Amino acid sequence: MVRLAPHLVKPLPMIVPAFDGERPDRRLGVGLNLYDVMAVDKLRGRRKRDGQQDGDDFGGDWSPERHRIIEGDEVIERAPALAAREPTGGYLFYDCQTDDSRLVLTALEEAERFGAVVANRVDAVELVEKNGRAVGITARDVESGEQFVLNAANVVNATGVWADRLRPAELHDDAGLPKIRPSRGTHITLRNEDLPLNDGVIVPAGEGRSIFALPWLGSTLVGTTDNNYDETDLDHIKPADADIDYLLDATNSFFATSLTAADISGAFAGVRPLIATGDPKKSVDISRRAELYETGSGMITITGGKLTTWRRMAKMAVDRIVERDARDAPCRTEEIPLGQAIDAAQLPRVEGLPEEAYEQLAGRYGYRARDVLAVAAESGELAQPIVESGPLDLLAEVVFSARHEQARSVGDALLRRSRVALLAASEVAGEDRLVARRVAQAMATELGWDAARVDAEVDGFLDEAEAEGIVAHSSSAA
C-alpha cells in the first residue's frame, strides 16, 4: 500500500525500548530478523524484479530498512514520553500507518472511476435466489425506507462482521453457522502533549501481551484490546470501561505517567470478523487469516483478514469469479495507484490557513486537496477549523464530504469522513451542541435541510456519539 498510495500510507518507525542497563532481548532480535525477511527483503526483492528504484513508485520515496539497535538518547528523541524512564537503548524497526477512513474512501473513488456504482445509506436486506441460485439482493434505502431489488450475475458477500447475516436459503438452518466470531478492539486517543511521541512504541500490557502507542493525526493513539464480543449489536460498538482501564493502566505503568479518563481525547472500538474455529480459544489466539467460500447458491463470501490484506482479499474474490466464468481477466490492482499524491507546496493558498493544514490536506486527500481548498476559499467561515483550538480539520472538509463523498449526516462527516470526533470527542459531542450544530448548518446548505432537520441531525449525532462511546469513561471512576 505504501507503493500504491504513498500519500495515505506512511512509514512508521517502531521502538522496543530497554531500561536499567538491560540489553535488548535477543529473542526479540530473532523475531525481527524474521520480520525483515518476510517484509523488508520481500518488498526489496519485488522492486528489483520489477526494475524499480527507490523513489519511482507513484511519488513514493521510501524503502524500508532492516531493524537495528539504537542508543538511549535516540529512543528519547523518537519517544520523548519515555524520558523520565531513562531508556538505555532498544530496537528500531519499520511498519506503516494509515487513516483507514481515507484509505477506504479513496479506494471507493478509484472503483467509481472504473465504473463501479457506490451508494451510501443502503442496506442489504436479503439474498434473492432463483432456482437455488443467487441472482441479486433485496436492498433498502435507509433514509426513505424503500426496498428494491438489485439483480446481479455474481453476488459477493464482503460485509465483514455482518457476513453471516446474508445467507442463502440452504444455510438458514445450518448448525455449523455462524462462521464469524467477533472480537472487539478498543483504542483511546490522547493529546500529544500528554504523551509526546514522534514514532511508535510497543508497550507491554501483562500476560505476555503488548499494545501500541503511536503518533496519529496529530494526537497519540493507544491500543488495542482483543476480547470476545458476544453482543448482538454490530452497528454501534462501544468501548468497554474495563478495556479503557486496561489501556490506561498499561500506558501509565510503562511511561511512568498518571493519566486518567479525563485526559482521554476520544475512544472508539471496532469488531474484527475472525473466523470461528470451533474451539474455545480466546479471540487473541485466533488467526487473522482471510477465508473465501462458495455455497451451492453461487454466492461467494470473503471474510476474516485485516486492513493490511484488503486488496489481496478482493483479488481472491474476483479471481474466483473469473475462474468460474472461464474468463481471461488477470488482476491489475497491484499496479493501479489509489488517488494521486501531491506535494503540499504545490497546493493553492487560502488566506488564514496555517502551513500545517496544507500538509494534512495533502496527506489526507492527495491531489483532491485542491478541491477541498477551493471549498475553503468560498468563505472565511469554511476555512476555519471544525473545533476551535482542536485538530486542524476544516469546516470546508465537511462541505466537501457532503458534496463529493456522499456524507448524509453529521456522524458521516465527523466519524466516517474524518476522525475529528475521535480526537476531540468532548468538544464535538459537548452538551452545548455548538460544534455539532455548526457542522449540521454547513451540511444543510449542501443537502437542503431546513431548521427542523438541522435540529434532528444534531440530536441524531449526539445519540450516535453516545452509542459509539467516543467520550471515554473509566470503570474505576464510575
Please name every model-derived segment:
Residues 68, 117, 148, 181, ...:
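Residues that recognize and position ribonucleotide moieties
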Residues 130-133, 141-214:
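Flavin-dependent oxidoreductases
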Residues 8, 19-38, 44-48, 52-54, ...:
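C-terminal accessory subdomains/tails of enzymes that are appended
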Residues 124-127, 212-213, 292:
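A structural signal for short hydrophobic beta-strand segments in well-ordered beta-sheet cores
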Residues 3-6:
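Long, low-complexity intrinsically disordered regulatory segments of eukaryotic signaling proteins
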Residues 91-154, 314:
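Helical element adjacent to the flavin cofactor pocket in flavoenzyme catalytic cores
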